[in-house]
Amino acid sequence: LGPKIYGTPLIIGVNWLTLSIATYGISSYIFRHNTFIILFASIFMVFTDYIIEPLAGVLDFWHWSLDEIPIQNYIAWFFVSLIIQLILVKGNFKFNIKLCCALIFSQILFFIIQYFNYGLF
């Protein structure tokens, strides 16, 4: 997946930014209160990571040293997501809800297909 920083491909950061924007767009469409937008989007990001992580090693995106995903990964991503969502809320950005839904749907669908492809379901 290209150049890496601390063992993680840079494109993963780009993907996380895209997912952050998409989850923010969906959250801000559903909720009006900033706290709910931030919390829902951050939880959605962790849910998405929960889908991606088991396949990361299989797809050779990255590997965990003990071949199991540490809970700290999900906790860290929740807090990273909170910060990203807070920035997006403070910026009062507006994104196309259809595009945001399509981005999330395509990401999740890709990984679900990979689960079937690698016999993990």
Residue ranges and their predicted role:
Residues L1-F121:
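Aromatic-rich, lipid-facing transmembrane alpha helices and their immediate juxtamembrane interface loops
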